Amino acid sequence: MAAQKSLELLTGREREVAVGVGCGQSNADIAAHLHMSEATVKAHVSRVLAKLNAANRVQLAITMHDAGLA
């Protein structure tokens, strides 16, 4: 499964942020849940989108859902 192999490229923290996006959480919600700044969440989301070749949060959420992580 291509999505699963792509997810292996993510760091643990990137994966946690991606799960939050997949669950429909805002950057502020993810930041509060993971005890990090909103700017850090935004940076993680940008890196995750690039690593997974996703154009936007919706594509990322679909990827996470398809992988059973959201």
Feature roles, as predicted:
Residues 1-7, 33, 68-70:
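N-terminal regulatory/sensing modules of transcriptional regulators
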Residues 10, 54, 69:
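Hydrophobic patch in the ABC ATPase nucleotide-binding domain
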Residues 28, 65-66:
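Terminal helix-turn-helix DNA-binding modules in bacterial transcription factors
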